[in-house]
Amino acid sequence: MAIINVTPDSFADGGRHVGVENAVAAARSAVEAGAAILDIGGESTRPGAAVVSEDEQIRRVVPVIAACRASGGVLAGVPISVDTTRAAVAAAAIEAGADAVNDVSGGTDDGGMIRLIAERGCGVVIMHRLVVPKADVYSDGYAVEPGYDGGVARVVNGCLRAQRGRFMEAGVDPSSIVLDPGLGFGKSVKQNLELIARTRELSATGPVLSGLSRKSFVGRVSLGRDSGPDERLAGTLGLSVMHLAAGARVFRVHDVREHVEALAGAFAAMA
């Protein structure tokens, strides 16, 4: 799953894909590099990012999705997900040609999201996000480790199973649901690593998405220090390979070609 952020302030690629022409070119390059899905988002989830209105998100993502659908060539038929927590944005994106919704709130920020997914029959990624003070929602450098009574894997997996059940009760096809443990969202470095190691406990319920690409905890693990996003590729690839071995099957990434090659090699060795 290639990350196509049409935002000026995303942590790893902010501003790089702003504008329809730039975004479509990035999407085309990602597919040529081996991406199977495009994830297009109009609001950054980096620490401290400004809240973006529904109208502005729609203004950013809908023309890009429509242009991808109209461009043909390598983009013809490639599945597109829209990265949003707002049902109105998701509805507009689906009308423009999106096939799925990637919701970092897991359908909890907007009461209309579950109903929309059920009515439109589209795919959905449900992510776990610990509700902590806003400044800490996306941190992994806590002075005090976030509390997960019973252990982080048990709590996160239980929350995702319960939310998956709510989607299914509304009529969403279980085969269209992907589960995301929310690495880097309200977890310490140690807790992120535990979630990776115990992925099979969650993948027994449904396919698991790995969303660790270039996140700050990756640098703390691989480099032993705070680092910039551009320093985290090698660490990202290493942890992605481990996440594959642990059971993850969808990888949301900035660096498509590198991941395609690394994961293909790892998957062959696992066969």
Residue ranges, per PLM feature:
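Catalytic domains of carbohydrate-active enzymes, especially glycoside hydrolases
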Residues: 25-41, 246
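Active-site-adjacent loop and "lid" segments of alpha/beta metabolic enzymes
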Residues: 10-26, 45-70, 78-79, 84-87, ...
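Acidic helix/loop microenvironments that form the catalytic cleft of cell-wall polysaccharide enzymes
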Residues: 183
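Short acidic/histidine-rich motifs immediately flanking catalytic phosphotransfer sites
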Residues: 31, 35-36, 75-78, 97-98
